[in-house]
Amino acid sequence: MNERVLSLLSMCMQAKEKGHHVFFDYSPHVDRGQVAISVYKNGWKEDVDPDKRFIVTISGEVGYGKSSFAEVEAYLKELLA
């Protein structure tokens, strides 16, 4: 799973080149670890909610309020296209 987490981080950083701000927050203290990703299309603005939010568990488990790696990867790839 570490490779997939690094891939998500890389895509978040690439989004900046396209004018988007994608925040990547790793939380190791949560059971099994998780990554929260917040997407601001066309850049972050004060007092504006993100266009999209994802929470992915490092183990890849999907449950209520959690996204799969595949879902987040597909969204970010589309954002980078």
What is each stretch, according to the model?
Residues 1-36, 42-81:
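Negatively charged, low-complexity tracts enriched in Asp/Glu with abundant Ser/Thr
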